[in-house]
């Protein structure tokens, strides 16, 4: 050992230099694909600098205007109001009870002081309502959800399920927050299966009243927002029970909605027969007062039945324009689809905040670099680009998809077109499920991408992740919602082969089903040129081919298994395939809307930036599911390799305009409120937070 040391003497300085060189060599493997280490070239700066010198000069103002549309002013008004009121800003450390009171005061301030009246737009201008909801959720997600409970759920149920007498009586009180309310649908034993709800509303013809009862513990209304502290009313979903003159004695007319007062308007004391308990501390959204409700023979006037789709006369006669329980139930739930639309839209808002924080920090943070050269931004490392750039592209994709959803929803509210109602119902189910699931995963990626500083509560990833987590469950469990999409696709598939027509959203199945189900062209399967891979037609055709193939395969599987397992058993046996089908279809819709948004962008530089993001979104999704395309020879091995290389290159190119892309969200520092993402003196502000 001694002799070896003598033969190869090395000073401590040389040893440290060798270790540093090895580490830099290893780190170079994380750099962008074109940054190949060479003995004669620096490891980082050459390609990075040349690429930056050629990067797009993006008109940020034009891009932001195109992104944010016509409701910028109302969002800026909300941001400015809360920035001017430090007493209404949510601190990092706050108790559950204090957070609930703050959240209520925030909503009161927004409505009564700032003069923002969201309820006025729920029915008449949904696009503006959802823009308000996005801005409010950026301030505090608990506030966004509390606002949604008050106006979209409680208020929305009154104006959508009730008639003129209900709107006349309750609208102003809901609007100005005198009538705070709840949406009491979920029960301890039933959530997704709304038709299985057990709470009853029995008509008493002698007193012209309904009697609301909780028949057992499983029927206790659970997770009801606004119930634990602030709510005065509840829209209670219950089984309508009518007396009959036959041997049964009563008739179950299915689930209907009823307005039930739960607290005294003056004293705020719980009313007789109503029991309210607090659901307690939650993983997130602790500014929302979720409670549990039990009813013991609570009597309400007959007029409190929200009777748009079914009514009961003074003598107990039931009337409805819809002939069956299932049709009435479908119409009722169809009117409540706005909640899903809002959650999909709000989830994109959360994704914008998290992407902004992670990318601004990654541009600021510098670690390591070639010998005797400056350290480089961690966003110059290929591994960081791989984490964040496809996510940034996806954020834009989901933005345009949810904007489209809101537009279709607004059109539906104006026209009440039956086919459009069905279309929006399926599209909202799919986008709510897909987008919220993606955002939940992306929040963890963003937190990790910011290293140890991402773990600090003040930098918001923890609260964003915890608050958003429930988005995957409420307003419909994501797995259940995807099954609705799959069921709708199968229905359309069946109609096609029985000579029917398909609706607009699924039109590609009508137009090109035979083309997509034919054998792949062996020539185009090998094309690997950049122009071809970045051609929107190739990208959209690939997405549509996958969905069509999956649809055909799952239909055949269901038919095969139904012979031995029955319909329910066959569905369960094919469930994973059905979920994959639904996700594939939603991705196809998302890409189609992104391509359309790129095409319609009026500013050339903004359009070029969007095209980069769109290409990255499309090719990244194809690469992530490359096995599906390879299995059917839709993509040859050389083409798969070219897609992978181009995806890495596009991540590098999007990195070069990442600042402009996140700046277009126009989330000022007082909205993101994360010291590591401050646009000036971030480190200085971060040290001040901890007391230096």
From Swiss-Prot:
Subcellular location: Peroxisome
Entry GO MF terms: acyl-CoA oxidase activity; FAD binding; fatty acid binding
BP terms from Gene Ontology: fatty acid beta-oxidation; fatty acid beta-oxidation using acyl-CoA oxidase; long-chain fatty acid metabolic process
Entry annotated with the keyword Lipid metabolism: yes
Signal peptide range: none
Gene Ontology CC, one term: peroxisome
Pfam families: ACOX, ACOX_C_alpha1, Acyl-CoA_dh_M
Transit peptide: 1-49
EC top class named in words: oxidoreductase
InterPro entries tied to this protein: ACO, ACOX_C_alpha1, Acyl-CoA_Oxase/DH_mid-dom, Acyl-CoA_Oxase/DH_mid-dom_sf, Acyl-CoA_oxidase, Acyl-CoA_oxidase_C, AcylCo_DH-like_C, AcylCoA_DH/oxidase_NM_dom_sf
Subunit structure comment from the entry: Homodimer.
Protein name listed in UniProt: Acyl-coenzyme A oxidase 2, peroxisomal
Organism: Arabidopsis thaliana (Mouse-ear cress)
């Amino acid at each position: 050992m001694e002799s070896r040391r003598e033969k190869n003497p090395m000073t401590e300085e040389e040893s440290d230099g060798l270790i540093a060189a090895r580490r830099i060599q290893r780190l170079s493997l994380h750099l962008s694909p074109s940054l190949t280490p060479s003995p004669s070239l620096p490891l980082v700066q050459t390609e990075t600098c040349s690429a930056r010198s050629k990067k797009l000069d993006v008109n940020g103002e034009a891009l932001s205007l195109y992104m944010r549309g016509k409701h910028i002013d109302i969002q800026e008004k909300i941001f400015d109001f809360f920035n001017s009121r430090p007493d209404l800003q949510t601190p990092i450390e706050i108790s559950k009870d204090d957070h609930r009171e703050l959240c209520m005061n925030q909503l009161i301030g927004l409505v009564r002081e700032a003069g923002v009246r969201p309820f006025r737009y729920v029915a008449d201008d949904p696009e503006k309502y959802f823009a308000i909801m996005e801005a409010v959720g950026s301030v505090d997600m608990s506030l966004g959800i509390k606002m949604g409970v008050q106006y979209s759920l409680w208020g929305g149920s009154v104006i959508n399920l009730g008639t003129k007498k209900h709107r006349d009586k309750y609208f102003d009180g809901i609007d100005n927050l005198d009538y705070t309310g709840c949406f009491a649908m979920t029960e301890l034993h039933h959530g997704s299966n709304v038709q299985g709800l057990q709470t009853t509303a029995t008509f008493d013809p002698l007193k012209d009243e309904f009697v609301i009862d909780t028949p057992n513990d499983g029927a206790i209304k659970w997770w009801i927002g606004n119930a634990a502290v602030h709510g005065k009313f509840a829209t209670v979903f219950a089984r309508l029970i009518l007396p009959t003159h036959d041997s049964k004695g009563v008739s179950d007319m299915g689930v209907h909605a009823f307005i039930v007062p739960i607290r005294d308007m003056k004293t705020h004391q719980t009313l007789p027969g109503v029991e309210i308990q607090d659901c307690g501390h939650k993983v997130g959204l602790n500014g929302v007062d979720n409670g549990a409700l039990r009813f013991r023979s609570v009597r309400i006037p007959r007029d409190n039945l929200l009777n748009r789709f079914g009514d009961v006369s003074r003598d107990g006669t039931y009337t409805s324009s819809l002939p069956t329980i299932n049709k009435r139930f479908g119409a009722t739930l169809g009117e409540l689809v706005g909640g899903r639309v809002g959650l999909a839209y709000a989830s994109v808002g959360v994704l914008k905040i998290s992407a902004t924080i992670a990318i601004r920090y990654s541009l600021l943070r510098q670690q390591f670099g070639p010998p005797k050269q400056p350290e480089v931004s961690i966003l110059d490392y290929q591994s960081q680009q791989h984490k964040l750039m496809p996510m940034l592209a996806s954020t834009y994709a989901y933005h345009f998809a949810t904007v489209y959803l809101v537009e279709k929803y607004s059109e539906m509210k104006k026209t009440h077109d039956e086919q459009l109602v069905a279309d929006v119902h399926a599209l909202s189910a799919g986008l709510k499920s897909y987008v919220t699931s993606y955002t939940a995963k992306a929040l963890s990626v963003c937190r990790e991408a910011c290293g140890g500083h991402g773990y600090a509560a003040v930098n918001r990833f923890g609260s964003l992740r915890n608050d958003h987590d429930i988005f995957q469950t409420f307003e419909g469990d994501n797995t259940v919602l995807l099954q609705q999409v799959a069921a709708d696709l199968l229905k359309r598939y069946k109609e096609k082969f029985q000579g029917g027509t398909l609706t607009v959203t699924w039109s590609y199945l009508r137009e090109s089903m035979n083309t997509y189900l034919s054998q792949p062209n062996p020539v185009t399967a090998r094309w690997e040129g950049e122009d071809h891979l970045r051609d929107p037609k190739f990208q959209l055709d690939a997405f549509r081919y996958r969905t069509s193939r999956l649809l055909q395969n799952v239909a055949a599987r269901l038919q095969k298994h139904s012979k031995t397992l029955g319909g329910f058993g066959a569905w369960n046996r094919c469930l994973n395939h059905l979920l994959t089908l639904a996700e594939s279809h939603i991705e196809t819709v998302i890409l189609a809307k992104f391509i359309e948004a790129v095409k319609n962008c009026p500013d050339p530089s903004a359009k070029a930036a969007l095209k980069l993001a769109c290409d990255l979104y499309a090719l990244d999704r194809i690469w992530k599911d490359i096995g599906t395309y390879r299995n059917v020879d839709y993509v040859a091995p050389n083409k798969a390799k070219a897609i992978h290389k181009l995806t890495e290159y596009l991540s590098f190119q999007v990195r070069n305009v990442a600042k402009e892309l996140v700046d277009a969200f126009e989330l000022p520092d007082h909205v993101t409120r994360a010291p590591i993402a401050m646009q000036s003196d971030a480190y200085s502000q971060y040290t001040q937070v901890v007391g230096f």
